[in-house]
C-alpha cells in the first residue's frame, strides 16, 4: 500500500443501522440528572414547623395561649390574677407513604446504565412531591379555619384579577400580598416573622415582570441591581415583595379534590379557585415519626430486587391566623 493511499478500517460501531451510523453500537454515558424527570423542588420543608416523634407516639400536642392583659390598679383592691385563655392543637401522623418498584435481574444484567440508582432517586422524589402537596393543602385548610374566640381564624384574599389565566396580573398580585400583610398585622402577627408565598410559575413570572402605569418594571429592575435578589444568573428563584419571599411551585392543589381517593382523607377539599398561599412558619406543623428511608429486599424466587421508599409524617394546623389563601373567586 502506497503511503498516500486511503485505508478501509473496520467500522465495528455501525452495526446494521439504516441509514448508516458508525457509532450505533457504542454505549452512551448516562447521568442520573439526564435520565430522570426534572426535580419538582420541595419548597416547604424548611419553611414551617417540624417536630420529630419518638417511637410509640401517634400525635403531638402543641399548647396554645392567648395574649396576656394589663389593667390599672385601684388603691385598696386585691389582685386576684387575670384569666388567660388556653387551648391545644393535636397533630397526628398519617398512614405510611410508600413508593415501591421491582427490578428484574435480566434487565439489570443487560442494562448498560445503573437503573437501580435512577429508580431509587425517583422514588425519593415522588415522596418529596406528595409531602410538598400535603403541606400546601394543610396551609390552605388552615387559612379556611374559622375563628374560635378569642383565637382568630385564617385569612382569605379573593380577587378575580388574581386568576392564573392567559395573562395573570403581576400588579394585582403585588397589591394582594400587601393586603395580606395588613391582615397579618391586624392579627398581631409579629412584623419580624418570616413570611412566604407560593404561586404557580405563570403568576411568579407575572410578578417578576410587573410594570407600573409608566411601563417601568417594579421588581425586575431591583433584581438586576442587587446581587442577592436573584436576577438573570439565579433565575430569581425567590423574589421579595413587601417583605414576603415569593417562590414558585408545581405542587399546589388547584382542582377539586373533595373526592380524590389518592389524596389522604383529611386533606381532601375543593381547591379549584385557589391560586396561591401565603404563610408564616408557625401556621402549621409537621409531625415526623419516620423520615424518608429506602429498603431493598432480594427476591430469589423471582430473580429480582424489590425496592421500597417510605415516609411516615402528618400535618396539622397550629396558628390559622398566620395562613392566607389567595382565591380567584
Region annotations inferred by a language model:
Residues 106-186, 325-329:
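Alpha-helical scaffold segments that mediate packing/assembly in large oligomeric complexes
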Residues 98, 122-123, 305-309:
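Oligomerization/assembly interface segments of phage tail-like spikes and tubes
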Residues 59-60, 67, 80, 87-117, ...:
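Structured, hydrophobic secondary-structure cores that serve as assembly/anchoring elements
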Residues 2-46, 53-56, 63, 67-69, ...:
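Sequence/fold signature of self-assembling virion shell proteins
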Residues 70-71, 75, 87:
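Membrane-topology and secretion signals of cell-surface/extracellular proteins
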Residues 75-80, 262-264:
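Short, polar loop/linker segments at the starts of domains and inter-domain junctions
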Residues 141-142, 202-209, 245-248:
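Internal, well-folded beta-alpha domain core
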Amino acid at each position: 500500500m502506497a503511503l498516500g493511499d486511503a485505508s478501509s478500517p473496520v467500522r465495528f460501531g455501525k452495526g446494521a443501522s439504516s441509514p448508516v451510523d458508525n457509532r450505533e453500537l457504542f454505549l452512551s454515558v448516562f447521568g442520573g440528572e439526564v435520565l430522570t424527570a426534572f426535580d419538582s423542588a420541595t419548597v416547604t420543608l424548611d419553611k414551617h414547623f417540624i417536630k420529630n416523634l419518638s417511637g410509640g407516639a401517634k400525635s403531638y400536642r402543641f399548647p396554645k395561649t392567648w395574649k396576656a392583659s394589663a389593667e390599672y390598679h385601684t388603691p385598696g383592691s386585691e389582685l386576684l390574677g387575670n384569666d388567660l385563655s388556653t387551648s391545644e392543637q393535636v397533630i397526628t401522623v398519617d398512614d405510611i407513604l410508600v413508593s415501591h418498584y421491582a427490578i428484574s435481574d435480566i434487565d439489570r444484567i443487560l442494562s448498560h446504565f445503573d437503573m437501580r440508582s435512577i429508580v431509587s432517586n425517583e422514588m425519593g422524589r415522588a415522596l418529596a412531591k406528595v409531602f410538598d402537596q400535603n403541606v400546601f393543602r394543610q396551609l390552605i385548610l388552615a387559612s379556611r379555619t374559622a375563628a374560635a374566640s378569642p383565637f382568630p381564624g385564617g385569612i382569605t384574599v379573593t380577587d378575580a384579577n388574581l386568576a392564573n389565566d392567559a395573562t395573570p396580573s403581576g400588579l394585582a398580585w403585588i397589591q394582594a400580598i400587601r393586603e395580606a400583610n395588613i391582615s397579618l398585622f391586624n392579627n398581631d402577627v409579629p412584623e419580624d416573622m418570616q413570611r412566604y408565598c407560593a404561586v404557580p410559575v405563570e403568576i411568579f413570572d407575572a410578578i417578576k415582570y410587573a410594570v407600573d402605569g409608566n411601563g417601568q418594571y417594579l421588581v425586575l429592575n431591583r433584581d438586576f441591581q442587587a446581587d442577592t435578589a436573584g436576577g438573570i444568573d439565579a433565575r430569581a428563584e425567590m423574589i421579595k415583595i413587601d417583605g414576603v419571599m415569593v417562590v414558585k411551585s408545581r405542587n399546589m392543589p388547584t382542582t377539586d379534590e373533595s373526592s380524590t381517593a389518592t389524596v389522604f382523607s383529611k386533606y381532601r377539599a375543593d381547591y379549584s379557585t385557589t391560586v396561591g398561599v401565603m404563610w408564616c412558619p408557625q401556621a402549621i406543623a409537621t409531625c415526623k415519626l419516620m423520615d424518608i428511608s429506602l429498603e431493598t429486599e432480594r427476591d430469589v424466587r423471582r430473580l429480582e430486587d424489590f425496592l421500597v421508599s417510605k415516609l411516615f409524617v402528618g400535618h396539622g394546623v397550629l396558628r390559622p391566623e398566620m395562613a392566607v389563601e389567595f382565591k380567584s373567586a
